[in-house]
Amino acid sequence: MAKQYETVIGLEVHVELATKTKIFCGCSTAFGGAPNTHTCPVCTGMPGSLPVLNKQVVEYAMGIGLATHCDITRVCKFDRKNYFYPDNPQNYQISQLYQPIARNGYVEITVGDTKKKVRIHEMHMEEDAGKLVHDEWDDTSLVDFNRSGVPLVEIVSEPDMRSSEEVIAYLEKLRTIIQYLGASDCKLLEGSMRADVNLSVREVGTQEFGTRTEMKNLNSFKAIARAIEGERERQIELIEEGKAVIQETRRWDDNKESSHAMRSKEDAQDYRYFPEPDLVPIVIDDEWIEKIKAKQPEFRDEKLERYKKEFDIPQYDAEILTESKHMADIFEETTAICGKPKKVSNWLMVETMRLLKEHGMEPEDISFSPANLAKLIGLTEAGTINSSVAKEVFEQVFEKDVDPESYVEEHGLKTVNDEGALEEVLKEVIAKNPKAIADYKGGKEKALGALVGQTMKAMKGKANPGMVNQKLREMLK
C-alpha cells in the first residue's frame, strides 16, 4: 500500500509598515524614489551614526499583536542579527529575538466549512535591508539603499497549516486585519507584504516533523500556492527514492514553476544574535496597551455580522465589500448620504469592480468620493438619466471624481421625457422597420426589443427605455 503523506507548513510573513519615516531615522519610506535618495548615515550604516526608534512602528506592531490575540511583551528589546551581504551596510540587522514585541497569538481561518486557529509563535520588529539591482548586460550588481531601514513586522506562525488552501486563507485574513488597522497596504507585488514558506512532509500519523525547507521569492497568492504544491511533490519524490531532504532556502521561479537551492537554511545561532547596545528596552505599560486597544477599528468579521442585521444586501455582496476597508468605508458613507444600501452595493459590486479590473487597480486605489456616487444614484432614481447614461457618467466619476449633476447638465445627458418628441421619433422608427413590426405582430416579442434599441439610438440614449417600450406597445396595437 502506498504511503500517505501530510504537508506541514509554517509561515514567516514580513509586513512593511505604513510609517512616513524609517524605523531608526527620519528618512522617507516613500516607494519608487530615485535610487539612494531616501538615505542618511544611519540607514547606510555609517560609523558613529546612532539609531533613534520611531514610536509609530511600536504602536503599529502593538496594534497588529492585539488584533491577532497576542500577548504584548511588557519589556521588549532589540537584538543584532549578524550577517554579511551587499544590501546590508552595517553587516548586521537590528531585529528582535529574545524579547519580541508580541507572542502566543492566533488567527482564525475558514476553509470550506471548517474553521481552524493558526497559532502565532511570535511577532517582532526589524529594519529592512537595501535592494540589489542586477544589470544583465553589464554583469554587475548595484545597491539601492532607499529600502534600508524601512520598518517591518515579521509574524512567525506555528507549523499549523496542512495545505495551500489553509495558507492562502491565513494570509488573506492576516492581510485584511492589517489593512483594516491602516498599518500597511500589504501589496505583495510592491513587496509591502512578503511570505516565506517553511514546508516539510511526513507520513500520515507521524508526530515527528520532517526536514523543512524555506521557499522565497513568492510575490502573489497564486505563486505561493504553486510553490507549496511543487515543493511538496519534490520532497515526497526524494523520500520515495530513499534520498534525504536537505534543510535549505530555495528560490521559487514562478515562470518555470520550479525552485532551486539558494543556500543552506540557517538557525538562530548561526546569526550570533546579541542585545543591541544602542537602543534602550521598551517598557509597555497597561495604559499604553489600553490606548492602542481603544484605537482598534471594527474588523471585517464584525462588519459582516453588522451588515447582515443593518443592510438588506446578499451575503456574497457583504463579503466582497468588506474584503477591503476602503471599499467598506465607501459603501457605508454613500449609504449614509442616499439611504439606498442595495443600490450602492450594486454600483460597487458591478461597475466599480469592472472598472477596477479594466484599470488593473485594487479597491484601495478607488479615489472617487461617496458624495458623487450618492449623487449619481439620486439622478438614476429620479429618472433624470437612464441606466446606460448612468454607466457613462460613472466612468467619469471613477476616473476623475467629477460631479455627476454638473457633468449631466454640461453634456446634455438628461433623459427626454417629452411624449410629443418621443412619438415623432417612434413614427420614423416604425416606418423604417416594417419587418420588425410584422414579426412583433406575428407574436415575436424579441422584435419589440429591436425597435426599442433603434429608438434609443435615434435619441442618442437619452430616452426612458420604459416609456419607449410602453409607447411602442400602444402605437402597435
PLM segments and residue spans:
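Basic, nucleic-acid-interacting segments
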Residues: 1-298, 309, 315, 336-340
